[in-house]
């Protein structure tokens, strides 16, 4: 079986089909144009540079294009890159299905739906339960397919749902340890906090930001969605405002994207749960590509640190 891109080590030669996830134009110090492309397969992605590109080449190598690439793997300033020696667009008779090249959540969609539904079923506050069920049903198809982000954490097909399922299990464990927490509020906050990303982001493959995403962002989008759902369900109660606050504050600080800091206990805990799950996902994926006794490539979203994998960890 042919190796996947994440399985190659520094110095190894590569000759493989990959999908262009993103392609970004830049200008080199010599004034010539180049492309920074992120190439992916189900195991993950890797950055590559295409130097001295013509306008015709730019039009060829765009997002969602399958390419055949030959080159080698190198470590450039702590980042793993693919140095391209040859590249061409794949022929239709070679590969055609883009879905064969995308990373997916390690849990089946139907299993995630079942688990999330069970958490909603356990809610005892009827207003919170109705609002949560209504909004999840409204956006369920996209919720199950979309990534949680364009980069950094859970940036794969079904990553949003996988992030939520992991956070729900964390929320349950923390609620059992601290019974003063309102489980209904916390579970609803987990399910709804990033649901606006199904409007903020373009889709599960070659994900970019929509116009609404660029101008409003998923936090504002979801606060509005909760308000609309409350009107449709004729719920006029404080739970609506508290849920809106939990979503609004889940990034923790204004400089991190939240207009208000958490001012409700469950909002504070949601912020920590969200942060913990995102960071664990980033570390696990980086360490999963690393041999025992070696350091990961630098993880930009974690202060550009490289993490060491102990020799006794297989």
UniProtKB/Swiss-Prot annotation:
Its EC number is 3.1.-.-. PROSITE patterns: HD (PS51831). Keywords: Exonuclease, Hydrolase, Nuclease. GO terms for molecular function: 3'-5'-RNA exonuclease activity; nucleic acid binding. This is 3'-5' exoribonuclease YhaM. It comes from the Bacteria. The keyword Nuclease applies. Shows a 3'-5' exoribonuclease activity. Belongs to the YhaM family. Residues 163-279 form the HD domain. GO terms for biological process: rRNA 3'-end processing. Pfam families: HD (PF01966), tRNA_anti-codon (PF01336).
């Amino acid at each position: 079986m042919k190796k996947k891109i994440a399985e190659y080590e520094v110095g190894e030669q590569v000759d493989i089909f990959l999908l262009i996830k993103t392609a970004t134009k830049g200008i080199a110090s010599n004034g010539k144009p180049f492309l920074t492309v992120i190439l992916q397969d189900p195991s993950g992605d890797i950055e590559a540079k295409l130097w001295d590109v013509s306008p015709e080449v730019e039009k060829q190598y765009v997002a969602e294009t399958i390419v055949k690439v030959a080159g080698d793997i190198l470590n450039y300033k702590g980042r793993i890159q693919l140095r391209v020696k040859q590249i061409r667009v794949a022929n239709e008779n070679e590969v055609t299905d883009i879905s064969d090249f995308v990373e997916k959540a390690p849990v089946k969609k139907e299993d995630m739906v079942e688990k999330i539904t069970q958490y909603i079923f356990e809610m005892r506050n009827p207003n919170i339960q109705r609002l949560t069920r209504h909004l999840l049903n409204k956006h369920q198809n996209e919720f199950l397919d979309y990534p949680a982000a364009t980069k950094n954490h859970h940036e794969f097909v079904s990553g949003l749902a996988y992030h939520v399922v992991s956070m729900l299990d964390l929320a349950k464990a923390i609620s059992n340890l601290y019974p003063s927490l309102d489980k209904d509020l916390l579970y609803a906050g987990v399910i709804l906090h990033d649901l606006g990303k199904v409007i903020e982001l373009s889709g599960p493959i070659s994900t970019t930001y929509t116009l609404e995403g660029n101008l409003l962002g998923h936090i504002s989008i979801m606060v509005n969605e909760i308000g609309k759902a409350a009107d449709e369900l004729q719920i006029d109660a404080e739970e609506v405002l508290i849920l809106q606050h939990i979503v609004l504050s889940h990034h923790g600080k204004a400089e991190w994207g939240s207009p208000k800091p958490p001012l409700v206990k469950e909002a504070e805990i949601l912020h920590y749960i969200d942060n913990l799950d995102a960071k664990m996902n980033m570390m696990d994926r980086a360490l999963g590509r690393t041999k025992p006794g070696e350091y990961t490539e630098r993880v930009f979203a974690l202060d550009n640190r490289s993490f060491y994998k102990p020799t006794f960890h297989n």
